[in-house]
C-alpha cells in the first residue's frame, strides 16, 4: 500500500535544489511528518517483506530533504551548546515520556530526532543518527555509532566502539542491517549496506563492507555483502592466486552453537 506522502516526497526530490527553509509551510510539514513518523517507529527506512529486506527509497529521500528545509540553530544540553539542523530526540522530554518509551538512556548519549528506539533497549554513551531503527532489548554499548538509517534488530548486542555505517554520506543505496539476536564484537565495523543475518556473532575487530570477501571455511565459498544467519565470523586473510600476498577477509569459522550462545547471551538484569 502506497503511503499518502510518498508521491509528495518523490515530487519534492525531483526539485530538491529549489528547497530551502523558506519553502512553503506545506512542503516543510510534509517532510517533517515523515521524520516524525520515523521518530515514533510508524515508518522505517527498510523492513523485511516476505523474508527479504526492502528499502523505502522515498523515506530515505525525505531524510535527505529535511536538511534542505532546516536552518542551523543553537541547541543546549545543560551548559553544553550545539549548532545543528537536526534536533535531538529527547529535547523537552518529561520523565513520563521516558517511562512510556521504556528504554534506558545513559548520560553522554546522543540520539537525533527521526531515529527510533524500542522498549527495553539500553543506550550507553553512544551516537544514534537520524533514520536509524533500534529494536527491542538491544544493547548499544559505549562509543557505538549507529549510522543514518541503519536497522538494528531485536536482542542485538553492539559492543564497545562498534561502528554501523550510515547511508547519507557517502550516499548508499541501502542501509546497513543487523538482524535479530546478533552479537557484534568490540570495535567491529559493518558498513555500505551489508546485512548480518540473524543469530550471527562477529568477533572483536571484524570489518565488513561491500567489497570485503566473506569466506566460509566449511564450504570454501566466497560471498560479498551478506553474512548468512547463524554464522560465527572472525578476521582473517585470503591468499591471492600468485601467492605473493594476502588480503583481508571476514572468515566464517563455524555456525553458532550452545557454547557460542553461552558466551554472547544478553543479560536481562541490565534491561529496564
Curated annotation (Swiss-Prot):
<dbReference type="InterPro" id="IPR023180">
    <property type="entry name" value="THP_succinylTrfase_dom1"/>
</dbReference>
<protein>
    <recommendedName>
        <fullName>2,3,4,5-tetrahydropyridine-2,6-dicarboxylate N-succinyltransferase</fullName>
        <ecNumber>2.3.1.117</ecNumber>
    </recommendedName>
</protein>
<feature type="binding site">
    <location>
        <position position="141"/>
    </location>
    <ligand>
        <name>substrate</name>
    </ligand>
</feature>
<dbReference type="Pfam" id="PF14602">
    <property type="entry name" value="Hexapep_2"/>
</dbReference>
<dbReference type="InterPro" id="IPR011004">
    <property type="entry name" value="Trimer_LpxA-like_sf"/>
</dbReference>
<keyword id="KW-0028">Amino-acid biosynthesis</keyword>
<comment type="similarity">
    <text>Belongs to the transferase hexapeptide repeat family.</text>
</comment>
<keyword id="KW-0963">Cytoplasm</keyword>
<comment type="pathway">
    <text>Amino-acid biosynthesis; L-lysine biosynthesis via DAP pathway; LL-2,6-diaminopimelate from (S)-tetrahydrodipicolinate (succinylase route): step 1/3.</text>
</comment>
<dbReference type="GO" id="GO:0009089">
    <property type="term" value="P:lysine biosynthetic process via diaminopimelate"/>
</dbReference>
<dbReference type="InterPro" id="IPR018357">
    <property type="entry name" value="Hexapep_transf_CS"/>
</dbReference>
<dbReference type="InterPro" id="IPR005664">
    <property type="entry name" value="DapD_Trfase_Hexpep_rpt_fam"/>
</dbReference>
<keyword id="KW-0012">Acyltransferase</keyword>
<keyword id="KW-0220">Diaminopimelate biosynthesis</keyword>
<dbReference type="InterPro" id="IPR001451">
    <property type="entry name" value="Hexapep"/>
</dbReference>
<dbReference type="GO" id="GO:0016779">
    <property type="term" value="F:nucleotidyltransferase activity"/>
</dbReference>
<dbReference type="Pfam" id="PF14805">
    <property type="entry name" value="THDPS_N_2"/>
</dbReference>
<keyword id="KW-0677">Repeat</keyword>
<dbReference type="GO" id="GO:0005737">
    <property type="term" value="C:cytoplasm"/>
</dbReference>
<keyword id="KW-0808">Transferase</keyword>
<comment type="subunit">
    <text>Homotrimer.</text>
</comment>
<feature type="binding site">
    <location>
        <position position="104"/>
    </location>
    <ligand>
        <name>substrate</name>
    </ligand>
</feature>
<keyword id="KW-0457">Lysine biosynthesis</keyword>
<dbReference type="GO" id="GO:0019877">
    <property type="term" value="P:diaminopimelate biosynthetic process"/>
</dbReference>
<dbReference type="GO" id="GO:0008666">
    <property type="term" value="F:2,3,4,5-tetrahydropyridine-2,6-dicarboxylate N-succinyltransferase activity"/>
</dbReference>
<dbReference type="InterPro" id="IPR037133">
    <property type="entry name" value="THP_succinylTrfase_N_sf"/>
</dbReference>
